[in-house]
Design a protein with these regions (language model features):
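Active-site core of glycosidic bond-cleaving carbohydrate-active enzymes
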Residues: 65, 69-70, 378-411, 432-435, ...
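Acidic/polar, glycine-enriched structural segments that form the non-catalytic walls/loops
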Residues: 19-376, 395, 405-411
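Acidic/histidine-rich catalytic neighborhood
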Residues: 478, 482-533
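Primarily short, surface-exposed interaction patches in extracytoplasmic proteins
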Residues: 330-339, 343, 361-375, 385, ...
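Catalytic cores of secreted or luminal carbohydrate-active enzymes
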Residues: 124-158, 163, 669-710
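C-terminal motif of bacterial Sec signal peptides marking the signal peptidase cleavage site
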Residues: 15-17
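Acidic/His metal-coordination segments adjacent to aromatic residues that form catalytic metal sites
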Residues: 362-375, 426-442, 499-516, 649-664
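Sec-dependent N-terminal signal peptides
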Residues: 4-13
Length: 712
């Protein structure tokens, strides 16, 4: 009992330190409202979304999905949920075991990895099938059917006076525009806890028969990165109206072995008709009209009357609560020319991460907007998607996706067993079933392994209780068991090695890589945390783990600079080693400093990377990672410079999305990384005693913050 009292007291003191004593509380309404996105034209990169973490609906400038084809190569007009998945038939009966290939990385046993094969044949095709399947579904487009007097469809170029706002404080998109001189007013919102959309429309075009609602359904493409809509194969799927009355309609969708339901309820009389296969028209009878549409996986939804109004009310209640709890950062008193833009990015990133990355599963890199990597999620990215929720005092949003790991345990355990290791090995690319996607790169990644320990520790810090230890302790232990058995002991030099891996910097090869600096530091940190969890559970420390922690190799360096890995002696000569993620900076940026590194060497490395790195070949989270490294090294000006670096992959669009390139127009790990860095640059980290340690003290960065949590 005394032990727990001390733990709770320590946590209380920590929380007290999370809110600085300010002269006045931040005006959160003003902070949020001044960053509302405003759209005035059709632009495929300005699509806005509503959602709740498990469901998202993305719209064009009409407030619905009226012109999806025009947005397909920008930010697609997606309708996605966490449960909406599909698999193509498997007539050849491929087995995952057919993708296994044996490797020997000098650990005393053979290891089986699920990989891709270059040679054509059954193994190649099996790997392709398991990469593509299952894939995330686009559940259907809901748009306006706008017609001219001659019956032709109105084109987007003919729509005028567009004025669209995302009201962040209420989670509602408000859109107005004119068609042939007549105004159309639209409100769009998502229910905060169900896969339900609410829409209200007011326009004289309705009574003229010139405005209807269309519903269009597609077959999945199975594409690597696209809107997942194939409209060319109507015979491969079915759309049935299984029940209807004056204001309630239930549709059943069948795609091979998968089914789902779409329930529509209007607030007045309407009719539903079929224009063509998978293309339905909803015709209202009043110039003021509202409806809800709910997507369900097993049975039709039961929707009460007046649900559109109730959904708008629930949306407002949820989002006002969201913005008034947890952390906030106000840059209105900062005079640096970049401050306003940084504030905009932070506000919009909070909204996007809440609607796209706060669901029951780890999110895909493009969230619930459109498919990337077939809609599957990457566990090495879960840190970037979710850690900020803890630092911004919204720990419940982190916990939502942590339960999935328990369901993935049997498969993660089997991966470790077939590779000859203890514990469990978290896979890189997967789906709700936890099936490992074969990969020539991903199957050899290892930096996702400690993430579970890191995130469980954040949950414990927020709620230091026996219940948290009970809930997560087993998986913390199993995760650490793998890490301990994976490290190879070098008897000649009396140290442990990490080898046979592809590092976070994916330009390194598994067969050559030894002791990449970030992974070694992460092993050091996470194994130490795992020992603390044993002590909290009244279990003695594992002596073998202590030996591992003590004998991990110091980070390899040359000429005062840290190497990409111990074998990469030409790190600063070969562009292969100075492209992709500058992961060496994560050894201090994402993690606390440790005995394996020298701060002066890390400063040298930071300076070299800022000046010379191949920044054209980087990713959105590389900038916040660099900023966090600079902040921990007491280089706040460099931290800000890194966070606001003017590079393509550090671009934030009008809607807040982190643009990467023509393939990845949405990249949520960048948004999450920005929020992690911003919180850390304000609230600091364990042992830090400086307010806003990540911002210069030259008078240009007068930053006000509240209710943020220090990083470990």
């Amino acid at each position: 009992m005394k032990k727990w009292l001390l733990v709770i007291l320590s946590a209380s003191l920590l929380c007290t330190a999370c809110t600085k004593d300010k002269a006045a509380k931040i005006d959160r309404l003003a902070l949020v409202e001044r960053n509302n996105p405003h759209v005035t034209s059709f632009d495929s990169l300005t699509a806005l979304s509503v959602g709740n973490g498990n469901f998202a609906f993305t719209v064009d400038a009409t407030g619905l999905q009226t012109y999806p084809e025009s947005y397909a190569k920008g930010i697609p007009l997606g309708t996605q949920t966490q449960w909406g998945w599909h698999s193509f038939p498997n007539p050849n009966n491929y087995k995952l075991e057919e993708t296994f290939k044996e490797y020997d990385f000098g650990r005393g046993h053979k290891e089986l990895y699920a990989v891709q094969f270059n040679e054509k044949g059954r193994q190649h095709d099996a790997a392709d099938w398991y990469r593509i399947n299952p894939h995330r579904l686009h559940l259907g487009n809901i748009g306006f059917e706008l017609t001219n007097e001659d019956g032709t469809l109105v084109q987007s170029k003919d729509i005028e006076s567009i004025d669209q706002h995302l009201d962040l404080w209420n989670g509602i998109i408000e859109s107005t525009f004119k068609v042939n001189g007549e105004i159309v007013e639209v409100k769009t919102a998502a229910h905060p806890s169900s896969d339900r959309l609410a829409v209200s429309v007011a326009s004289p075009l309705i009574s003229k028969g010139a405005l209807k609602i269309n519903l269009r359904f597609s077959y999945p493409t199975g594409g690597h990165a696209d809107d997942a809509c194939d409209r060319t194969v109507p015979n491969k799927h079915k759309t049935e109206v299984v029940s209807q009355d004056d204001n309630n309609y239930v549709l059943k969708r069948t795609l091979d072995a998968d089914t789902y339901f779409v329930t529509l309820k209007t607030d007045g009389k309407s009719t539903l008709s079929e224009k063509e296969a998978h293309y339905l028209l909803l015709t209202p009878e009043s110039d003021e009209f509202s409806f809800v549409c709910e997507f369900t996986d097993s049975a039709a939804a039961q929707i009460a009357d007046n649900n559109a109004g109730l959904t708008f009310d629930e949306s407002s209640k949820y989002w006002q609560d969201f913005w008034q709890r947890g952390g906030a950062i106000d840059f209105s008193n900062a005079t640096d020319s970049r401050a306003k833009e940084l504030e905009r990015r932070i506000i919009l990133s909070q909204y996007l991460m809440a609607i796209q990355s706060a669901g029951m599963y780890p999110p895909q890199e493009t969230g619930l907007t459109y498919n990337s990597w077939f809609g599957k999620f990457h566990l090495e990215m879960h840190w970037w998607h979710a850690v900020h929720f803890a630092l911004w005092n919204r720990i419940d949003l982190l916990e939502r996706s942590m339960d999935w790991y328990a369901t993935a345990y049997p498969i993660a355990k089997s991966i470790a067993e077939r590779q000859g290791f203890d514990g469990l090995r978290w896979m890189k690319m997967t789906d709700p079933s936890a099936t490992e996607a074969p990969s020539k790169v991903g199957s050899f990644l290892i930096w996702q392994q400690p993430h579970f320990i890191y995130m469980a520790e954040l949950i414990y810090r927020a709620n230091p209780s026996p219940e948290v230890i009970e809930k997560y302790g087993f998986l913390v232990e199993e995760t650490a068991k793998f890490m301990a058995s994976f490290a190879t002991y070098d008897e000649l030099e009396g140290r442990y090695l990490l080898k046979g891996i592809i590092a976070a910097q994916e330009t390194l090869r598994a067969s050559e890589t030894i002791n990449p600096p970030f992974e070694v530091s992460y092993w050091h940190y996470a194994m130490g945390v795992a020992q603390k969890w044993r002590e909290r559970a009244d279990t003695s420390r594992n002596m073998e783990w202590d030996e591992l922690i003590d004998k991990l190799s110091p980070l390899a360096s040359k000429d005062g600079l840290y190497l990409a890995s111990e074998d990469a002696l030409d790190t600063y000569i070969d562009i292969r080693f100075t492209s992709d993620h500058p992961a060496v900076l994560g050894a201090v940026g994402m993690l606390p400093q440790n005995k394996l590194l020298r701060p002066d060497y890390m400063k040298n490395t930071l300076d070299w990377i800022l000046e010379n790195w191949n920044w054209g070949k980087t990713w959105g989270w590389d900038y916040p990672m660099t900023a966090m490294c600079a902040a921990r090294l007491n280089e706040p000006a460099k931290a800000v410079d890194a966070l606001m670096m003017n590079k393509r992959t550090n671009t934030y669009l009008l809607n807040g999305h982190n643009y990467q390139d023509a393939r990845l127009r949405v990249y949520l790990p960048g948004n999450g990384g920005l929020l992690i860095a911003a919180a850390m640059m304000c609230a600091g980290w364990d042992g830090n005693e400086i307010d806003t340690p990540g911002f210069p003290k030259d008078g240009t960065w007068n930053v006000q913050w509240e209710d943020l949590v220090p990083m470990p």
